[in-house]
């Protein structure tokens, strides 16, 4: 088999909304530049995701020199400008972490509240915000637990071969997609180099109900697919279901689509039970 290559790079500026495909990207300690640097919360500061508000996956972002431009079904276009953000910081909750986050503006709060039909607020990972990966001296954005997620095309193909209705890679929300490797080869990788960056694969990614949300319709699959099928061959002893690998970047640098993926070192892959 020819060398493994990077085939897709995706950043998700707003947690749980649509990703933006990039031809090249700067990788920082927190992951891809701008990835999960915005989060939507309830009025108490608890984060909101597509797990409970699946319509978020239909919110489209475009990056500009001064901020973002947002579009969503039935909503007027919204321009987000960094210079208009408030100077107020408030603690927001992402899982068990409390992060001091910069409140953006009442106008943006109202836009998301109207779209979701739910009172909410919108925050940015400002210069005074700080969060670390658990157990590692490594900065983190509003991502679930790790800065980056990698999945191979072969792994998705192996899953889709078991599904009645194939799913798109977008339902798993990876930052990095690679091709020209065996299915689940990434399970055994420990350190890899892509472009200028060395990555350490620190943990398989446990999957939840969010993977059942169709990225085009914003609706959940009633049969809980593909999670139900994944459970049959990707459930570990801890009863979690895993698909994809969490990464941290060991240095900052640039990567681009077409870069070779160099496997620097390997480790024993997680074991999974298989059920009928």
Where are these regions (language model features)?
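Metal-cofactor-dependent catalytic cores
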Residues: 1-276
């Amino acid at each position: 088999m020819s060398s493994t290559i990077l085939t897709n790079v995706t950043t998700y500026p707003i947690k749980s909304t649509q990703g933006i495909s990039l031809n090249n990207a700067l990788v920082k300690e927190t992951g891809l530049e701008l990835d999960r640097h915005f989060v939507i919360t309830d009025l108490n500061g608890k984060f909101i995701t597509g797990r409970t508000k699946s319509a978020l996956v239909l919110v489209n972002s475009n990056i500009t020199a001064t901020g973002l431009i947002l579009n969503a079904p039935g909503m007027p276009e919204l321009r987000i400008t960094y210079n208009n953000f408030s100077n107020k910081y408030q603690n927001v909750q992402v899982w068990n972490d409390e992060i001091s986050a910069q409140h953006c503006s009442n106008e943006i709060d109202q836009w998301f509240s109207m779209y979701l039909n739910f009172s909410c607020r919108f925050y940015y990972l400002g210069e005074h915000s700080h969060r670390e990966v658990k157990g590692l001296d490594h900065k983190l954005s509003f991502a679930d637990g790790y800065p980056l997620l990698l999945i191979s095309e072969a792994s998705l193909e192996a899953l889709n071969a078991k599904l009645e209705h194939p799913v798109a890679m977008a339902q798993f929300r990876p930052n990095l997609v690679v091709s020209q490797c065996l299915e689940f080869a990434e399970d055994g990788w420990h350190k890899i180099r892509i472009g200028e960056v060395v990555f350490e694969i620190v943990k398989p990614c446990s999957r939840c109900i969010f993977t059942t949300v169709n990225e085009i319709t914003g609706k959940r699959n009633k049969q809980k697919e593909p999670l139900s099928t994944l459970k049959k061959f990707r459930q570990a002893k801890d009863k979690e279901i895993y698909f994809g690998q969490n990464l941290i970047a060991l240095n900052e640098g640039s990567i681009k689509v077409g870069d070779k993926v160099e496997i620097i070192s390997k480790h024993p892959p997680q074991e999974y039970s298989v059920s009928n």
